[in-house]
Design a protein with these regions (language model features):
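N-terminal intrinsically disordered, cationic/polar leader segments
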Residues: 4-55, 62-66, 105-142
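Hydrophobic (often cysteine-bearing) scaffold residues that line and stabilize catalytic clefts
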Residues: 78
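Alpha-helical support elements that line or immediately flank enzyme active sites
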Residues: 82-92
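A short interface-forming secondary-structure element
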Residues: 73-75
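Glycine-rich phosphate/pyrophosphate-binding loops
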Residues: 91-108
């Protein structure tokens, strides 16, 4: 499996093909549409991310020492953003996720082109992913 940085570099390369931000938004929507559906049983208050204007559910499973994320949102652009985060971070260890510098967010211009509420939502999604990583890293240390 590719490293987090290799996956980030792939994302940056794909987004460099577009100079117009409308095309980048369309790519986010397409990525959201391609995101595997989240089982309805996971669309609950426990998996709802606080701090997002849209509703975003994030499910985390611990499989063979790695975190596997699935998610959904009721907003297409937000669904695309969480799809990017899942693509880069899912399948990695809690330590790798905790130590990751998510530079792709800035390199593709995401921070600069999101509304303040969507930027806050992006930060909330990253924070929730890192919280899962911290929780599982703590469980590993206790085992």
């Amino acid at each position: 499996m590719a490293t987090i940085n290799e996956l980030q570099d792939e994302v940056v390369e794909e987004f460099q093909d577009f100079t117009d931000w409308m095309d980048k938004y369309q790519m986010l929507i397409d990525l959201g549409n391609e995101l595997a559906p989240l089982d309805e049983k996971y669309k609950n208050e426990q998996n709802l991310i606080d701090g997002c204007q849209s509703r975003v559910w994030l499910q985390c499973d611990y499989v063979d020492g790695k975190l596997v994320f699935t998610a959904d949102s009721d907003a297409l652009v937000v669904k695309g953003i969480i799809a990017l985060l899942i693509r880069v971070l899912s399948g990695h260890t809690p330590t790798e996720i905790m130590d990751a510098d998510l530079y792709f967010v800035e390199k593709i211009g995401l921070k600069d082109h999101l509304s303040p509420t969507r930027s806050n939502g992006l930060l909330a999604m990253i924070k929730q992913i890192r919280m899962y990583a911290l929780a599982y890293k703590t469980k590993e240390a206790e085992a």
